[in-house]
Amino acid sequence: MKHLLINLISFLLLSPFLTSCEKYVGEYKDGKRNGQGTITWSDGKNYVGEFKDGKFNGHGKLTWSDGKKYVGEWKNGRPHGQGTGTLPDGRKYVGEYKDGKKWNGTVYDNDRINISKYINGVKQ
């Protein structure tokens, strides 16, 4: 019974990792993803772009199965630099990201009407 309980707990702790399987096709250097590549996850999420030391770095596009996407610059696995984030309903943020956060840019609705702005990371 003790072994069964330990196995059940182990399975429950590891199951989130088992369901997030990924497939990588691309370049490697020193055993890490470096250069151009594509990752596809079992949940439908997909990244196509550049890698450095195993992280998204440079230009790339991350798409979720629900239609959400980010296209632009990456640094250390986070949006950083110029990019566009689009939601499934068509709203989008266009501008600068800093360490994964909206920094200086504009949010538009699906008719390209300005909804709001971000200045130095603060929504106006």
PLM features: residue spans?
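Glycine/tyrosine- and acidic-biased, solvent-exposed loop/turn segments at the edges of beta-strands
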Residues: 5, 12-124
